[in-house]
Amino acid sequence: MRLESVAKFHSPKSPMMSDSPRTTASDSLSGTDVMAAMGMAQSQAGFGMAAFCGKHELSQNDKQKAINYLMQFAHKVSGKYRGVAKLEGNTKAKVLQVLATFAYADYCRSAATPGARCRDCHGTGRAVDIAKTEQWGRVVEKECGRCKGVGYSRMPASAAYRAVTMLIPNLTQPTWSRTVKPLYDALVVQCHKEESIADNILNAVAR
């Protein structure tokens, strides 16, 4: 079972899973099976499960849990980023909270996010390769150049920068780009990594 199945299980319109017992290994998982698998996955990959469940609006509590996990990770690695490492206690904590909140929001974006769908590919992540289409006489697609194949635009890092400058008024754009934004980017990447870990664990425990 994959994480996407968890989202479908929580959808009232999804017929894929039910509480009826399985008759063969290939039958749909029962509600009890799913909840047991989720519990095991949460015990081993709490960050990834919270990140995914919050992303898919399955739980508001999971959203906050994911941000808290991300803040813990940010604090752990902050010493590698000069613009954050030099900050004093309370200011540093607030900056990490801002970075974690915006990074998680970026991770949560999708083609379904209002205003985020790519204007060129309309959320498909694919675009027509005009040169090859003319060469081969049939439609040939390629990765969308605007969104790099994801189907949506990322949250502008400038939004996080503006929020951080409320706490560090003298933070210039160049300094942000060199010494703080790399941490912001690392937090977004970490969310995706943790989701992947949770997905693999869930698949293993629900075989």
Curated annotation (Swiss-Prot):
Zn(2+) binds at C118, C121, C144, C147. GO terms for biological process: DNA-templated transcription termination; transcription antitermination. The keyword Metal-binding applies. It holds the Pfam family Antiterm. Residues 1-29 are annotated as: Disordered. Gene3D superfamilies: 1.10.274.110. The record marks T101, A160, T165 as: Interaction with host rpoB. One of its GO terms (molecular function) is zinc ion binding. Signal peptide: none annotated. Residues 171-192 bind DNA. The record marks E134 as: Interaction with host RNA polymerase sigma factor RPOD. The keyword Protein biosynthesis does not apply. SUPFAM superfamilies: DnaJ/Hsp40 cysteine-rich domain. HAMAP family: Antitermination_lambda. Interacts with host RPOB (via flap domain); this interaction renders host RNAP resistant to transcription pausing and allows it to read through termination signals. Interacts with host RNA polymerase sigma factor RPOD (via domain-4). Interacts with host NUSA (via N-terminus and AR2 domain); this interaction releases the autoinhibition of NUSA. Belongs to the phage antitermination Q type 2 family. Mediates the switch from middle to viral late gene expression by associating with host RNA polymerase (RNAP) so that the latter can read without pausing and through transcription terminators preceding late genes. Competes with host factor sigma 70 for binding to RPOB, the beta-subunit of host RNAP. To join the elongation complex, binds a specific DNA Q-binding element (QBE) and interacts with RNAP that is paused during early elongation. Participates in the lysis-lysogeny decision by activating the expression of the late lytic genes. This is Antitermination protein Q. It comes from Escherichia phage HK022.
